[in-house]
Structures are given as C-alpha cells and as structure tokens.
Regions:
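C-terminal polymerase-core module
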Residues: 472-479, 483-532, 702-750, 754-756, ...
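Non-catalytic nucleic-acid-binding/docking modules located in mid-to-C-terminal regions
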Residues: 50-53, 98, 121, 140-144, ...
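Conserved catalytic core of nucleic-acid polymerases
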Residues: 453, 565-566, 570-573, 648-781, ...
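Conserved RNase H-like, two-metal-ion catalytic cores of nucleic-acid enzymes
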Residues: 3-4, 8-53, 69-70, 74-81, ...
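Active-site-proximal helix-loop-helix substrate-binding element of RNase H-like nuclease domains
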Residues: 152-176, 183, 322-448, 472, ...
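Conserved "right-hand" nucleotidyltransferase catalytic core of DNA-directed polymerases
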Residues: 230-338, 347-356, 413-593, 609, ...
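Noncatalytic, basic helical substrate-engagement surface that gates or grips nucleic-acid strands
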Residues: 1-129, 133-155, 159, 233-236, ...
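Function-dense linear segments that define catalytic or interfacial modules
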Residues: 360, 366, 378-407, 411, ...
Length: 837
C-alpha cells in the first residue's frame, strides 16, 4: 500500500508564513487553511496514495522535554492568527474524510517514523511530506521524504541524500548529534559546525565511531578537546534528534484510508471561508439549490420562453456553460442569442444582473448600450468585500445565506439568484455604496466591454523584428558571461549561477537560502561593482523578460484583426484599480529605453491618431487636498514644480537654488510618504545613511505638519472602524491592523495611509473614463477609448477629430472632481503610443 503521511505542523507553518494574511469579509484569518489545502491537493494529484495520514503535534510536553529542559526552548509560540485557524482546518479535514493522528507526549516526527516503519514491515511504501529536514533520517528504499521548500517539493530518496550530504540517511542523526540544531535548541558539540560534523561522520560512520577514533590524525587537536569535553551533550543530542518508531498509535495502513466524511459540511465550511475555487477542486457542490435540495425537496421549475414583449424586472445570470437565463418571480427563462440583445435595451424593463460586462459586450455588438441594466450583483459583492479571491453567484448565495426558492436543473443557481441580489443590494445600501455602483462601477463595466471589443492595433512585424534583435543581444550577453566566468552553465539555474558567482569568481555572498546562494535581483544589484559578469546577468534577465513576457506574449495575443484585445478586470485590486490580463497591458515597461520601445509598436489604425492624456502627480494632489496642508496646496495652486518647491521648503533655500539631487530627494519623499516608507527604505532609495534619511523625514514632516497628522489619523480611524475609505466612499477592510504580528500590523498601517489616496486616484480615473466615453458618444465622434494605464487614458481618433478629442480629454479629466487643488492632465498625440505619451 502507498501511504502518504503529512507532517501537519510543519506544513501548516509553511503555508501560514508563505502566504500573506488572507481574511474573509468578516475578518476570519484563512491563509494557513488555504495554503495547507493546496499543498494537500497537489500531493494527492501528484502521487495518488492509497491512504493518507495527517500527523499533528500535541501541546503537551514530550519525553524529549523531560530529558532536556532546554528542548525547543528558544521557539516562539504559535502566532495568534495561525492558532485561530487550526481548529477550523482540522474540522475541515475531518469533513473531507481525512484521518488525523496525534499522541500526547509524542511529536508528529515520531508518528511519521512509526507509520513509515509499520508500512514498510507490511510491504508498503511511504511518502513523508514535510518541510522539516529532520525526517530525512527516515529515508530508505521504501520511504521517500517529499521535502517542501519555498519554491517546490523535492523528493528525497537515498541517492538524493547521498548526493547532497555525502552520507546515508540514517547518518544524518549522527551529524546532528555533533553539530546540534538551533531551531530545536539541540546543543550538539559547541564549536562543531555542519561542515566538520559531515566530514567526521563521512570518515568514522557514526557518533560512536568518532569517539572511538579521537586519537585519529584526521581530528584536529581543538576539535578533539571540544569532543572530549562535550561527550554527554553529544549523546543527549543523539537521543533528542532521533525520530522514534514506536509511538503508541494505530499503525495499520488501512486505518488511514480516506472516508466519505461529510461533503455537505465541508462545502458549507469552505463557503463560509470564501474558498470557492477549492470547493471545486475537492469535487464538492456548493450551489445553494443543490445544498438545499439535499436537505429538503424544493419545487422543480421548468424553464420557459421569454415573452415577446417583456416588461417589469428580471434578474439575469449566466450558467457555467455560458448560456444566460432570466428569473422573474418563480419563472425561469432561458435566453437565446435572438432574444437576449433586445432584452438588454428594452423599454419598460429593468435588469438586475450578475456580471454586467459580458452583457454589455452583447449589447454593444448589436448597436445597443445595455440601458436596461440597473444593478450588478458581482460588482456589489466586490464593493462589499474587495478582499475576496473570487465572485461567483452560487458561492456568494451560500456565503450570504440567500436561500433558494426553487430548483431548476437547467439553471442550478437560478433559485437563489433573486434572493442573492436582494441581500447584496440591501447590504450595499447599508454601507452607502449604491451611488458608487450606479455612477461609477456599473457604467465603467460598459466602458471596459467596449475597450475589450475595440482592442489596440499593433505593428506585428515591428515586434517580430524587435524580438529578433533581443535574441541576438541575449546570445551576445550570454557569451560574455561565459567568457567572464570561464565555462558554460545554465544561467536560469539559481544553484549553478550561485556556484559561478561565489565559488568560481569568488564574489562575497550576501545571503543564503535553503537551496544555496541567493541570486535574487537585490543581491545581484549589490554585487555590480565586483564583476562585469553581474551587470551582464542583470541585463540578460531584463532582456529575457522583455522577450518572453512581452514580445512573444503580445504576438500570441494578437487577434485576427491585427489588434490586441486585453481583458480588463474590475474586481481584483483591493484599492479599486483596474487590472488587465491576456495580455497585461498595464505592465508594459517604460523605465528603460528598450522597454519603452515596446510602446512604439502600439499604433493608430491607418488614418487615425492616438491621443494620450496623463494626470500629473494626481496622488500628490489628492494628498494636498485630503490633508489640507496649506504649504503643499499653495505649491500646486501656484503651478510650481512640486518636487522643487518641496526641496526649497525643506532646505529653506530659493527654488532657483534647488539642485537636481535635492529635487530627486524631495521627489522620493513626496511619493515615499504615501507608501509609509521609513528612514531605512528612504535611505536605500536615495543611497544615503539611515540617520540622514531620518533627519530628512523629520524635516519634511515639520515642513508639512498636516501630512503627518493625517497619516496618524488614518491609522487610528482604521483601527477603530476596521476599514479605510476613499473620498468616494469605497471601503477596504484592514484586518491586518488587529494582528499580533508586528510585520503584518505594520503592513496594515501602510495600507491605512496609502489606500485613501491611491484608491481615490483609482476612483477618479474610473469616473473620468465613464465621462470621456459618454462625451465621445454624445458628440457623435468616431473616436474610441482604447486603454487605461494607471493615470493615463488613450483614445484613437480620426485626424479631423484630434483637436476635439484633446479638448474633451482635458476637460473631462480635469473637471471630474472639484478639489482644493486643481487636477491637471497633460495631453499628447502621435501615430504610436510612444510618440503620444
């Protein structure tokens, strides 16, 4: 029998610390529950075990604590945010049918060892899933450790351990006896490190072998002294580190076969945890109609034909197969392609829908605008809880306890649709978010549908040639690197790259990971001065990213009409910003010459021109307005260069005396203050000491006192309310502020400071998009809104409409709100995006 045993505590800790804190809309922490399930599902998919045991530590002391008071004494307690998730996770695993095992006085490691030994004796094979290398001592031909690392799960068999450590798996405990283990506070022999311990065990075979050969010349005098003086500690460490195989638990592998569990309870719990995609991965059905039908018999409704002259209110949603249906009372209508378009603009009809954007696509394709759509449940759910990972009608109905009124086999979620839209509308009204939905988000869905439909023309041949030149450049860079290092290697392998830089070239290593030397961008940036190879490696990475993500990615996304049709997502960013995918046009790089060249391949159609309008320093203007700081407001009102004016005020010098370096410093702090940067981050950005940066920060806050007061008030109000708001009333819950973890809490404070500003900027650009799109239609222009990127709008216009479009963009963007400081938009034109910007 193939048995999979999970080291529960090890893996749940890895899940908790490896995933940022996730919460439900009511503030329940879920990241560890989410991550553990993903680990388990991936293991099941990859290995198809016959039985699964999940082993947990108990809170009670073990025999190791009895033997040594210091055992694990240096470990901190479990974070409260994780502790709250543990009982929920264990209940979920029980509902899913998994057998869990623990024993007071014994550790999960001992349970792994006991089950592996018993299954091997029965002729089976065992997979031990853990993030703890202690379990490697259990590896043999029948037992494989699946070692979870930050990036992947490594199967560790005897050959892999021999290759990595130069010893057999059972000898790893001999190594630990000598070197100790800081994480478990196992002492070992003071002064004997891993390298020495490995060498001793490789030569003498075991701890006992080392002590039997203390007179051997291979043992240096100082090592001999340490070994002789600490023999009892070494033997104690051997006992502490040895995994036992005789824990008093059920050892029959058949005992751990997965049971039926309680699927309905699991589905309900997952719905409460807002883990909808995981519900599907477990093969559970959480549609409200299905759940209710399992508990009671609902009246079955047969779909009907929509009346030829529909009137009144209908609720619309989409089945998983893409078909649409409408609900009116206890009637369900399946909508075919002929009747749906006319319904979307029918006079005398009001449509509450779930996910308006696809419907706006249909309306626009048929010459309409979707005028009958008055409410979107998906957008309402997003406004109520922007932190959710997904928004699906059936899942939200279960989450909001919207009970189905009937069952309909042809539309499983139809029975609860009206109840769901009712509760979402009520809750949005209670939150004061209806105006945000009606005037911004719902009209914006129409605008985004139109932008997706229109697309953005590109010069495909130019992109191909650019790709060819990048490949040639990459090949040249690669040859330079090989010449500098002295041999060829796989540049995409962190291990081989680390060996080339730190072993072959002798560069000073900055930090190490579990897999070896760190070769991340930050590390390489710090090593630029040591070797020209580092500069080439960074350049290689930049060019590779351009080629694979943008050049090849854009060509794959090219439509038959020669245009890129990106998908714009309204319900992803917690700040309210729009994102895009397939491809992501908002990440087209502009900070490098090569990256900005990509914008040159986004072109206007023949006979057309691109008109580009970009807000100038919108977030700083919002900061000046929202804080009421007179000095900052005056700088904007006078039309001054805000960064130059800031530098002049901080250093008490005339603006004419502000150097480029001083302006750069002022710019860094102007933007850094909104993102909660402290002296350390600011100093790093500016290349100055922490002390200098701290002085700079204090001077800045003394110069603009209301900015500091506002930032502090943001945090206090957010802690009191549990959320922050934009000036438009968009809310973002911040459960991070209640965390006992300092880093998590600090992150929440940064979000409390930044979200009102960044979120308000997002709201402004959204509202401007709605106004610009409508104005182009009202003035019956052929010009079309193509793209929004951060604070920038791009319109494609016929030559004879360019001046009119420039005026429309400037007026609508600058007049969309009236604040204490003016918004300004800079407008440019060109045949390419690069020229227009």
């Amino acid at each position: 029998m193939k048995l999979l045993v999970l080291d529960g505590n090890s893996l749940v800790n890895r899940a908790y610390f490896g995933i940022k804190l996730l919460t439900t809309k009511d503030g329940r922490y879920t990241n560890a529950i989410f991550g553990f399930q993903n680990i388990l599902l991936n293991l099941l998919s990859a290995h198809h075990p016959d039985a699964v045991a999940i082993a947990w530590d108990e809170k009670a002391p073990t025999f190791r604590h009895t033997a040594y008071d210091g055992y694990k004494a240096t470990r901190h307690g479990m974070p409260q945010e994780l502790a709250e998730q543990m009982p929920v996770l264990k209940q979920l695993l029980t509902d899913l049918g998994f057998v869990q095992v623990s024993k007071p006085g014994w550790e999960a490691d001992d349970i792994l060892g006991t089950l592996a030994a018993a299954n091997e004796a029965a002729g089976g094979t065992t997979l031990l899933a853990t993030g703890d290398r202690d379990s490697l001592q259990l590896v043999d031909d029948a037992n494989t450790v699946l070692l979870a690392t930050n990036r992947e799960t490594l199967p560790m068999d005897p050959a892999a351990i021999q290759e990595k450590y130069g010893v057999a798996p059972p000898q790893l405990i001999e190594v630990k006896s000598l070197m100790g283990d800081a994480s478990d506070n196992i002492p070992g022999v003071p002064g004997i490190g891993e390298k020495t311990a490995l060498a001793l065990v490789q030569k003498f075979g075991s701890l006992q072998g080392v002590y039997e050969h203390l007179d051997d010349k291979a043992i240096k005098p100082k090592q001999r002294e340490k070994l002789e003086a600490n023999k009892e500690l070494a033997e104690l460490s051997h006992m502490l580190g040895t995994i036992r195989k005789d824990a008093p638990i059920e050892t029959a592998p058949e005992h751990y076969c997965r049971t039926a569990g309680d699927p309905a309870a699991a589905a309900q719990l997952l719905a409460e945890l807002e883990m909808h995609k995981l519900t599907a991965r477990w093969g559970l059905d959480e549609s409200p109609a299905a759940v209710a039908a399992s508990a009671e018999t609902l009246p079955e409704v047969q779909p009907d034909l929509l009346p030829l002259a529909p009137e009144g209110r209908y609720d619309l949603a989409q089945n998983k197969d893409g078909s649409w249906y409408a609900v009116q009372g206890d009637s369900v209508y399946l909508l075919d392609n002929d009747r749906l378009p006319s319904l979307l603009d029918a006079a005398g009809v009001q449509l509450r829908v779930f996910d308006a954007k696809p419907l706006y696509h249909i309306a626009l394709e048929h010459g309409g605008v979707g005028a009958a759509i008055v409410f979107d449940g998906k957008l309402a759910a997003y406004l109520l809880n922007p932190s959710a990972s997904d928004y699906q009608a059936g899942q939200l109905a279960a989450e909001y306890a919207a009970a189905p009124a009937f069952a309909c086999a042809a539309a499983p979620d139809a029975g609860a649709l009206s109840a769901l839209l009712d509760v979402l509308s009520t809750k949005l009204d209670e939150q004061g978010g209806h105006d945000l939905l009606a005037t911004m988000e719902l009209p914006l869905a129409r605008v985004l549908a139109d932008m997706e439909r229109i697309g953005f023309a590109v010069d495909a041949e130019g992109i191909r040639q650019f790709g060819d030149s990048l490949r040639a450049e990459l090949n040249g860079i690669l040859q330079n690197i090989y010449a500098e290092v002295g041999y060829e290697f796989n540049l995409n392998s962190p291990k081989q790259l680390g060996e080339a830089l730190f072993d072959k070239l002798g560069l000073p290593p900055r930090k190490k990971t579990a897999r070896g030397y760190s070769t991340d961008a930050e590390t390489l940036e710090s090593l630029r001065a040591y070797s020209p190879a580092v500069d080439d490696i960074l350049k290689y990475r930049t060019y590779s990213k351009l080629l694979s993500t943008y050049v090849e990615g854009l060509l794959k996304a090219l439509g038959p009409d020669g245009r890129i049709h990106s998908t714009f997502i309204q319900t992803e960013a917690r700040t309210g910003r729009i994102s895009s995918t397939e491809p992501n046009l908002q990440n087209i790089p502009i900070r490098t010459e090569l990256g900005s060249r990509l914008r040159g391949y986004f072109v206007a159609a023949p006979g057309e021109t691109l008109v580009d309008a970009d807000y100038s320093q919108i977030e700083l203007r919002i900061l000046a307005h929202i804080t009421g700081d007179e000095a900052m407001q005056q700088a904007f009102l006078s039309g001054a260069d805000i960064h130059r004016a800031t530098a002049a005020k901080i250093y008490h010098i005339p603006e004419s005396d502000v150097t480029h370096e001083l302006r750069t410093s002022a710019k860094a702090i102007n933007f850094g203050i909104m993102y909660g940067k402290g002296a350390f981050s600011l100093g790093k950005d500016l290349g100055i000491s922490v002390k200098e940066a701290d002085t700079f920060l204090k001077t800045y806050l003394n110069t603009f006192p209301k900015v500091d007061g506002y930032m502090q008030n943001c945090i206090e109000h957010a802690k009191e309310k549990g959320y922050v708001e934009t000036l438009f009333g968009r809310r973002r819950p911040l459960p991070e502020l209640a965390s006992s973890n300092f880093q998590v809490r600090s992150s929440g404070e940064r979000m409390a400071r930044n979200t009102p500003i960044q979120g308000t900027a997002a709201d402004i650009i959204k509202l401007a998009m709605v106004h610009v799109w409508q104005r182009l239609r009202d003035e019956k222009l052929q010009a079309r809104l193509l793209l929004q990127v951060h604070d920038e709008l791009i319109v494609e216009a016929p030559e004879d409409e360019v001046e009119q479009v420039k005026r429309i963009l400037k007026e609508e963007m600058e007049q969309v709100v009236s604040y204490s400081v003016p918004l300004t938009a800079e407008v440019g034109t060109g045949k390419t995006w690069l020229e227009a910007h």
